[in-house]
Amino acid sequence: MTSPEAVDIPFEPKKILAQLPHMPGVYRYYDTAGAVLYVGKARDLKKRVSSYFTKTQLSPRIAMMVTRIARIETTVTRSEAEALLLENNLIKALAPRYNILFRDDKSYPYLKLTAHRFPRMAYYRGSVDKQNQYFGPFPSAWAVRESIQILQRVFQLRTCEDSVFNNRTRPCLLHQIGRCTAPCVGAISADDYAIDVSNAARFLLGRQSEVMKELEQKMHAFAAELKFEQAAAVRNQMSSLATVLHQQAIEVGSDSDVDILAVVAQGGRVCVNLAMVRGGRHLGDKAYFPAHVESALTLAEGGLGDEADGADGADEAAAALPGEPADEAAAARDAASSASGASSASVEAEVLDAFIAQHYLGNRVPPVLVVSHAPASRDLLELLSEQAGHKVSLVRQPQGQRRAWLSMAEQNARLALARLLSEQGSQQARTRALAETLSFECDDLAMLRIECFDISHTMGEATQASCVVYHHHKMQSGEYRRYNITGITPGDDYAAMRQVLTRRYEKMVEQAAQAAAADAAAGIDGESTREAEASSLLPNIVLIDGGKGQVEIARQVFTELGLDTSMLVGVAKGEGRKVGLETLVFADGRTPLELGKESAALMLVAQIRDEAHRFAITGMRAKRAKARQTSRLEELEGIGAKRRQRLLARFGGLRGVVAASVEELASVEGISHALAEQIYKQLH
């Protein structure tokens, strides 16, 4: 993305370096187009930034990055810890090309116990509040649902929506199969239900032994009072809990909330496997693959530290933080310590630093982190402890159960990385096959950009177009776009295709033309960086889900915009719409191609086409459902957002509102009898 402060004047580093202070802070490098190249943190800004421009033995990639620097910005902080926090925020926000970057996943699922008189268990994603109880985060939706099933089996807490709970007149099926105590119909008192909720919360917090002891005491008390049915119910609850504890690996101890981090590097890629233990229960794991890792690690290996500045510079490089390049002396020490393994270890430690900073700063962090490699940062752990409000311990060589967990995490990281490398090899082969099939010449196949369009509607209703993007040998979901199609005859797919292609590429063509005009006015010969970036947004291949008719519409649009029609390829479905029978139709008059089921090129085309279809149809269905679910209530006179929300909550949805009588409608807060009659008339 181009910054509004694109640089047009020559860059003179000496003047800038002379003005830098000997203070901690964060520095940012920008290119001529205003795009950020790198974000780093330094104990001494002057020493750190100067090291990039005073060394002569730089690796080719680093030398290339330095030549692209056109502007330097610095921010002074009060401490190195503040610099670390600011660096982490900027890396997430700017996604620099030469920093290790993990996808910022803020949607970890939680298990929620609501603040209702009879609390409900629920799967939850989003920001947490203080009103309800939240347990987690969990590594996956499956882990949350498994925990809910366990709590249903042992403590029989309800999972129904409040609107359903408030309107039940008899127990549901879950009560009949022993998964709910039916508080909706008064089958259990509020006090007894509160005890079950408390036991469930303690179970999730890892205090299983307390729960078992109290249940045992309760069972004996019922037996002493000759209440044998109640005693048998508690005995069954204890049996279910004992079965759960036996089936799962449970760690007994005060610090039963643990995260296990295993890092594996292989084949130029790195995997971080995060396993979560909550309440002593292993909840599963999740694999992360950082972006920009190749450039960032090459930067780290290239020797951009501060050894020229003496001992202080060496100390700073030894404590290099996530995304910050290590110095040549540190690299030399690594190589001397172990010719075979030290380099890999430094790479993995660098990635682990980046992951810990980006994953935990500003989020919940457990008291114990078990790691496969020792992070290089000395300030990171202190900052995590300060933000969490409790001490965060790092365990490098665990024992017992934790050692088994770390071993399992390392094995899963290796398996995930091997699977990724295998898939990448297959995808690269498919990309190469497609380029050869279409006679497309490309020096770097990773830069081959393919966009695919599809139209979806239901009998002309809720028409939507999708655009999916493929480059670097994989689908780029962050670049997908949906387009609401309006102003056409319902069901006219040709008009819809014309509209989406025009909206997609008209602005890109204008941006490229403006960049070229600006360069011409500035007297720049050849293609500048600004013009190259504008042109790079245009795809190399455009796939159209359709036959000759759709391709002809696309050809007309591209001709009007002055674009090359040879990049247009239609994907016509074969007999029975079976994969492998498609025909590729070209806009420039080439003979249509039938590649056959075994063609690697056709496999890639089908993959991209199917993804465009999926993305279009899910968007269309959501749009259609929203229109059908809410339109009738939104059209009611005298019903605003609050009253509409109360009606839906009271009757459980639009169908319940339609089925309600005038008296039932009038019983809702804010609905008078006259307004209830008006609502009833408008709905019937």
UniProtKB/Swiss-Prot annotation:
Which ranges carry the GIY-YIG domain? 22-100
Query: What Pfam families does this protein's entry cite?
Result: GIY-YIG, HHH_5, UVR, UvrC_RNaseH, UvrC_RNaseH_dom
Swiss-Prot/TrEMBL GO biological process terms: nucleotide-excision repair; SOS response
- The lineage's top-level taxon is Bacteria
Which HAMAP family does this UniProt record tie to the protein? UvrC
For this protein, the record's PANTHER family field holds:
UVRABC SYSTEM PROTEIN C (PTHR30562:SF1), UVRC/OXIDOREDUCTASE (PTHR30562)
**What is the protein's quaternary organization?**
Interacts with UvrB in an incision complex.
NCBIfam families the UniProt entry points to: PRK00558.1-5, uvrC
Q: What is this protein called?
A: UvrABC system protein C
Q: What is the species listed in this Swiss-Prot or TrEMBL entry?
A: Burkholderia ambifaria (strain ATCC BAA-244 / DSM 16087 / CCUG 44356 / LMG 19182 / AMMD) (Burkholderia cepacia (strain AMMD))
